[in-house]
Amino acid sequence: MQITDVRAIQPAGNNSPPDWRTSLGQILIAIDTDAGITGYGVGGGGLAGQHVVKTVLRDLLLGRNPEQISQLWDEMYQATLAFGRKGIAIMAISGVDLALWDLQGKREQQPVVTLLGGTPGTKMPTYHTVWSTQDLATSGEHAGYKLHLGKVAAPEQRDLMVSSIEQARISIGSAPLLMVDAWMKWDIESTISIAREIKSFQIEWIEEPLSPDDLAGYAILKEQTEVPIAGGEHEFTADAFRPLIEQKLHTVLQPDVNWCGGLTELIKIYTMAKQADLRVCPHRGCEIWALHAIAALDPQPLAETGRPWMTWVKGQPDIQEGMIEVSDRPGFGLLFDEAQLQLVN
């Protein structure tokens, strides 16, 4: 089997994200073969990511054997090394890598979860991300809930955040997990202070309180906070996760399979984390791409759900009673009609 074409588009759906995600949004990559099989993957980088796929990566992949996934990943990384290593180039590679895995599953008539040693139909608990405590009332049944918070600019804002977190715990009761997402907008002092005040609310983790580049800051938090710290959503490649894992700067690692380098790199991250006795909980885990890895590789499966960014993706399993089931269809189990996709201008 040989690759005959590599295509990339940026679809739009009814709930397509606004602002920066419109231009740096998710891109759909299709890899066609002479066997008549097409593999699909989703990466990031918007129009810039498309350009990387359609030029550098397409030139490298045409005529190649799509079954050599690991070798092709290494070659794509080398081909983009001068302008890549993180960000848009790795987001583009992520989508191509996922398309190659989708092809592999379709060729073998197996779901990706089976290729990874897991079982189709595996059910996993979910946690739901909300942007306010008011959203909790309409979030449905889940094993946990994550409250997305903003920047701490003044002491009174800190008090308001602590109060919001307390209200969230009261709202959901004592049984469900409760997480807090700072989205890289806190500082060391605020994180230590807030962590101290919310510890009694049974917080599963504080997510990304600092910039992903502030490893020194995370080292301080590791020593001075008792609430677990999660992060890695905005990190790229297994090599970049290595210091986080070796220094145990995060208790919970959150790679995004559509950004971090694809499934090939996510497998490496899981392997390193297991050796270090650290937990992996992929970002956007309920989306069809990450579910197969979570079902096959995760001893503590927990899948994140939230706003439906990729509404043009069909075949996504439904959440029922707080559980989600991995597909048993070949590949990732993606279903859609290419001719019906809307494109971002």
Predicted regions and their residues:
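Short catalytic-loop micro-motif centered on adjacent basic/acidic residues
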Residues: 41-42, 146, 178-181, 204-208, ...
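Flexible C-terminal active-site loop/helix
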Residues: 1-11, 20-21, 34, 282-345
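Catalytic alpha/beta core domains of metabolic enzymes, predominantly
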Residues: 213-305
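Metal-dependent enolase-superfamily TIM-barrel catalytic cores that perform enediolate-based chemistry
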Residues: 117-225
